[in-house]
């Protein structure tokens, strides 16, 4: 996961004005890092491009809104990276 984490942290730092050193696996992208929805869309686009996947952001948002998932499930860095790894693995399977 560290490679995925490093890439995602760099994408976040490059896309927003967040210092890469403040991004940890426990960081919540919205609550802790203060990433707004427009920046997050740019970040997701960059993640899609970097990893060759399509992050199902609408599905994740709907699951959170419907109470089927916590925001932590998708937006805490370590969980986001695990989801990205799963999407990459599913694509290559």
UniProtKB/Swiss-Prot annotation:
Indicate yes or no for the key word Lipid biosynthesis.
Answer: yes
| SUPFAM superfamilies found in the cross-reference section | ACP-like
Q: Name one GO cellular component term.
A: membrane
Instruction: Please tell me the species this chain comes from.
Output: Mesorhizobium japonicum (strain LMG 29417 / CECT 9101 / MAFF 303099)
Q: Where in the cell is it found?
A: Cytoplasm
| Residues in Carrier domain copies | 2-88
NCBIfam families annotated for this entry?
A: PRK06508.1
A GO BP term, please?
Answer: lipid A biosynthetic process
Q: Copy the pathway line from the protein's UniProt record.
A: Glycolipid biosynthesis; KDO(2)-lipid A biosynthesis
Give the protein name, as stated in the record: Acyl carrier protein AcpXL
GO terms (molecular function) for this protein are: acyl binding; acyl carrier activity
User: Pfam families from the entry?
Assistant: PP-binding
Keywords, sorted A to Z:
Cytoplasm, Fatty acid biosynthesis, Fatty acid metabolism, Lipid A biosynthesis, Lipid biosynthesis, Lipid metabolism, Phosphopantetheine, Phosphoprotein
Q: What does this protein do?
A: Carrier of the growing fatty acid chain in fatty acid biosynthesis. Is involved in the transfer of long hydroxylated fatty acids to lipid A.
The record's account of how the chain is modified after translation: 4'-phosphopantetheine is transferred from CoA to a specific serine of apo-ACP by AcpS. This modification is essential for activity because fatty acids are bound in thioester linkage to the sulfhydryl of the prosthetic group.
Q: Which Gene3D superfamilies match?
A: ACP-like
Location of O-(pantetheine 4'-phosphoryl)serine modifications: 37
């Amino acid at each position: 996961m560290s490679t995925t984490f490093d890439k995602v942290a760099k994408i976040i730092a490059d896309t927003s004005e967040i210092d890469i050193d403040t991004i940890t696996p426990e960081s919540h992208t919205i609550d802790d890092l203060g990433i707004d929805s427009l920046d997050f869309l740019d970040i997701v686009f960059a993640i899609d491009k970097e990893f060759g996947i399509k992050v199902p952001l609408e599905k994740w948002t709907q699951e959170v809104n419907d109470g089927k998932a916590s925001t932590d499930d998708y937006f805490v860095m370590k969980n986001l990276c695990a989801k990205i790894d799963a999407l990459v693995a599913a694509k290559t399977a």
